[in-house]
From Swiss-Prot:
Name this protein carries in UniProt: AMP phosphorylase
Keyword vocabulary terms for this entry: Glycosyltransferase, Transferase
One annotated GO molecular function: AMP binding
Lineage, highest ranks first: Archaea, Methanobacteriati, Methanobacteriota, Thermococci, Thermococcales
Keyword field contains Transcription regulation: no
Amino acid sequence: MRGKIKILDIETGNLAIFINPEDAEQWRIHPNDLVKIESGKRYIYGSAFIGNIVEKGEIGISKDVLSIHQFSNGEIVSLSPAGTPESVKYIKKKMRGEKLKKVEIETIVRDIVDRKLRNTEISAFVSAIEINGLDMEEIAALTIAMAETGDMLDIERKPIMDIHSIGGVPGNKTNVIVVPIVAAAGLTIPKTSSRAITSAAGTADVVEVLTNVTLTLEEIKRIVEKIGACLVWGGALNLAPADDLMIHVERRLSLDPRGLMLASIMAKKYAIGSQYILIDIPTGKGAKVESMEEARSLARDFIELGKRLGQYVEVAITYGGQPIGYTVGPALEAKEALETLMTGRGPGSLVEKAIGLAGLLLEMGGAAPKGKGKIIAREILEKGKAYQKMREIIEEQGGDPDIKPEDIPIGDKTYTIHAQTNGYVTAIDNRGITAIAREAGAPEDKGAGIRLHVKVGDKVKEGDPLFTIHAESESRLDKAIVLARRLEPIKIEGMVLQVIENL
């Protein structure tokens, strides 16, 4: 069938293609059938919607379709039934618990990227992996397929270093300090980061307070070849595009299969050509990984997968039992990170973690002798070399290199929670702190978040400030206050827990 494109001012949440009932009957197209639109070398798959919203001879497309391929009103295109994708039988194979071959995994990933598979089929694939798992051979094949169906970055400056934290700990602005330290030592580190999904700030959200993070692959290549580093948002790039489509389904199902998590992280590293990768696994109560046993098991998987991909991987299991530094939220974290870079000093939890991780990367890349990386990383930070490199990164990405911490606007609607008793801080609930910061507006409102006044082990008196909530609107602040009072994320106890009387 050939017809004229009609752009419809609607969003459906999927790739909807609207067909007049007469055309649908003539071409034997049924509701929700997979159909293909072609125009020259451009093509897209979508679900058929039958209705009189379009006239006979018209093919209606939603805004969702336009977000992937640009078609113009009145453009002549061809439309045809697509049939059942070949990959569906491979998904059924995994549902039966059978091992998938490399070519079968490649077919599934290609069909996901081409949008031949809808959310129902992708959900079945994700669920099959959750139930039956993937072995390391399958994970490696999936990783490579995810990377090679997207764009690949070719950087000539070697060696190429990379770092990734699996997250789960609020206030983790560590990589904003690690990256300039590593680059200042002469190594290459093109860091792509995510925005917050369930946290109060992703690395990209924090860096965006200081400079532009939405760059093209060509711009990244130019910057990295020139200064050895970047701090950009990976979501603006076509890196491992199947990953985003699968993550969308995982979130809806509240699933996070280990095999997919490993492939998701390593596919993006493979796509940008990372040779030496440090994985940070924060571990502790309230973190994504709560036990050392689970952390060690995950570490072994990362190392084994790296070997299969030709990448050298080391894993740092770090303390994740409370927030890193004293701030949570994009602007608050950017301010704290910039202060640390400018002065070479900062909260112990932030500085020690940053130089510890940076030191490992220096040793991995040959910029420091074994066992001396942390010392050299500290020196680079304290002598201002990391700050100078951060200025270069900010400027090359389109920001003002002269930005100062006091230039960063923070939410001016504030409320401070105080201690109700004397004692010691025995625990800070990571999930509670994150929930309150998000209720205050983070990460969408850059100035929203939480400033902690105490950490675990601190002695407090009744009336002492525990944390301050920052928001950009009174309504957001009020909601955050209600949640803070309900959750009580900071626990205070006396040294004497109970007295047993001699009766």
